[in-house]
Design a protein with these regions (language model features):
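Glycine-rich, flexible loop segments associated with nucleotide phosphate handling
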Residues: 39-46, 69-80, 96-99, 186-201, ...
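Short glycine/proline-enriched turns and hinge-like loops at secondary-structure junctions
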Residues: 23-25, 42-45, 95, 135-138, ...
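Ferredoxin-reductase
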Residues: 2-119
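Local cysteine-cluster metal-coordination motifs and their immediate loop/turn environment
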Residues: 153, 247-248, 269-301
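FNR/FR-type flavoprotein reductase catalytic core
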Residues: 109-271
Length: 301
């Protein structure tokens, strides 16, 4: 386990806002209790928390998507993992307070319940968990590949890179099945094409791809990223690739980085029961340095 931030704990968070940004995507903003500041204040992009949603009520019947009407009847027992799209530390009368932003997609009984959270509600979370992204100081170009709901931790990473590594150029490639599945505030610009406002606010270069061509480049983020690499001047030793998204995309990203001899970090995501390695349910098979050999490692570690 990464020892850069091995501290974690269970804390209460107060809902500040819960905004729908796309058909099935929401942005949840939380303020943690003061005791969480020493722990979450040093959190790295890419880490996550396990939310306890067992006591959160379902929304009214008319607000539950029709295809989830039966699914939401399942009883919740376990916490659910969520990464963060932003983290900030604010000062108020109580001292330093951590605020977190979670972007989530409504997919099942847990996330359906999350849509009913409103300002002032409280939820319990366990974290921060997992390993965050590393930020090498010698890099002057960071290429971020975000696939679907793999986008939140990369939005957080882009923000941190802009503030902590101002000398590093950040270029983002964000992809999804179609325009409706881009988990961002989307705007069509007259000159700039498809604009993702969250990255625009960070003053970060961003290229959009969709499988069906309904927004931006038609194709995969890895294809668009390779086109960019071929057309621009960059140095392999001073470049790093970060990625989060579907595993097939992460595999393609790793192959792309290997082809161009670029350092690469990928964030793996799995459904899990505990988030701390006890349940062993998030094992991921990966290659070793020995040809034809693989081993399993836990996604949460």
């Amino acid at each position: 386990m990464d020892k850069r931030n091995s501290h974690k704990g269970a804390f209460w968070a107060t809902v500040l806002s819960n905004q729908q940004i796309r058909t099935c995507y929401y942005r949840l903003n939380l303020e943690l209790e003061p005791a969480a500041t020493p722990v979450f204040g040093s959190m790295s992009p890419g880490q996550f928390a396990m939310l306890d949603l067992t006591q959160v009520a379902l929304p009214s019947q008319d607000k539950i998507p029709s295809h989830l009407q039966d699914t939401v009847k399942r009883q919740l027992i376990l916490r659910r993992p969520f990464s963060f799209s932003d983290m900030s530390i604010e000062n108020n009368d109580l001292g330093s307070i951590v605020r977190l932003e979670i972007m989530y997609c409504v997919l099942g009984p847990s996330t359906v319940r999350m849509t009913s959270l409103s300002k002032g509600d409280k939820v319990n979370l366990l974290g921060p968990l997992g390993n965050g992204f590393e930020l090498p100081e010698q890099k002057d170009l960071a290429i971020l590949l975000a696939g679907g709901m793999g986008a939140p931790p990369l939005l957080h990473l882009a923000s941190v890179l802009k503030t902590q590594r101002p000398q590093c150029r950040v270029v983002v490639f964000a992809g999804s099945k179609n325009c409706d599945h881009l988990p961002f505030t989307v705007r069509i610009g007259n000159k700039t094409g498809v604009v993702l406002e969250e990255f625009e606010q960070l003053n970060v270069e961003c290229f959009v791809t969709t499988d069906d061509g309904s927004a931006g480049f038609k194709g995969f983020v890895t294809t668009r990223a390779e086109e960019w690499l071929k057309k621009n001047i960059w140095q392999p030793l001073k470049t790093i690739v970060y990625a989060c998204g579907p595993e097939v995309m992460l595999s393609a990203t790793a192959k792309l980085a290997l082809k161009y001899d670029i350092d690469c970090q990928v964030s793996m995501e799995r459904m899990m029961a505990c988030g701390v390695g006890l349940c062993q349910s998030c094992a991921v098979e990966h290659k070793t340095r020995q040809p034809e050999q693989t081993e399993f490692r836990l996604c949460c570690q």
